[in-house]
Amino acid sequence: MARVSPTLTHLVVTWIALAIAVLALHNVFGNEVLPDAVYVPANVLTGVALVGVAVVAGASLDDLGLGRANAGNGLRWGLAIASVVAIGLAAGVALPATRGLFHDQRVAGLSGSELAYEALLRIPVGTALFEELAFRGVLLALLLRVTSTLPAVAVSSALFGLWHILPTISALRANEIAQGTAAAVGAVAGAVIVTAVGGALLCALRLHTGSLLAPVLTHAATNSLATLAAFAVQRAD
């Protein structure tokens, strides 16, 4: 992506700040205020709004990873990585040493239809597609207009890590783990670091393939298949 002229940099930075502000507000309201029933539509609408911000700021569909030219490449990479993820998760469930990592009380009481909703709609569309649009699409594209690749990836990935603070706190509460303050802080900090690193890898995948489809499929497969694995472990145990 071409860098903008110095005279336009401050305008793009303003759009970046607006996108970050939208994400921050959405993160708080989505985790603390809005009912779960509106999770998917709220995220879809926010994603569309962010794409609108990027387009107004001068980003093209190709800049966002949404162009048709690289879609086939993104699809191939995404499906290949999803297959590797599936094999890894299956091995994790089968091995006694790692099986316990899949215990998650949030899926324990799900019915078949609720599980299908989580794995086929809520996670792929409400989580994976939205977060990839936001962090590997809009933010990365706008950051690349004002800085080089490494800082752009670093900022996008750091924000992706911070994005997971509130969801991690909710997960800790639901599973009644890391009850002490120090343990909770450590768990949240660990989650931020892990997701930031994951975000950097997804950025690399996005840039390598030229398509947002690859990180979307990777993200969706990882989260959806992990949910199915957790459900299987809960039922079996």
Give, region by region, the residue ranges found by the protein language model.
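Short helix-capping/hinge motifs at transmembrane helix termini and TM-loop junctions
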Residues: F29-G30, A57-G58, P96-A97, H164, ...
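Transmembrane helix-loop-helix hairpins at the membrane interface
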Residues: E114-D237
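C-terminal ends of transmembrane helices
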Residues: G58-D63, F135
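Short, Lys/Arg-rich N-terminal segment immediately upstream of the first membrane anchor
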Residues: M1-L8, G67-A69
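Juxtamembrane helix-loop-helix connectors linking adjacent transmembrane helices
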Residues: E32-Y39, L61-A128, L144-R145, A174-A183, ...
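Alpha-helical transmembrane segments in multi-pass membrane proteins
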Residues: S5-A59, N73, W77, G109-E118
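Short acidic/polar alpha-helix capping motifs at helix-coil junctions
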Residues: H10-L18, H103-A108, A119-L121, I165-I169, ...
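Aromatic-anchored segments of alpha-helical transmembrane domains
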Residues: I16-V28, A86-A91, S157-P167, N223-L228
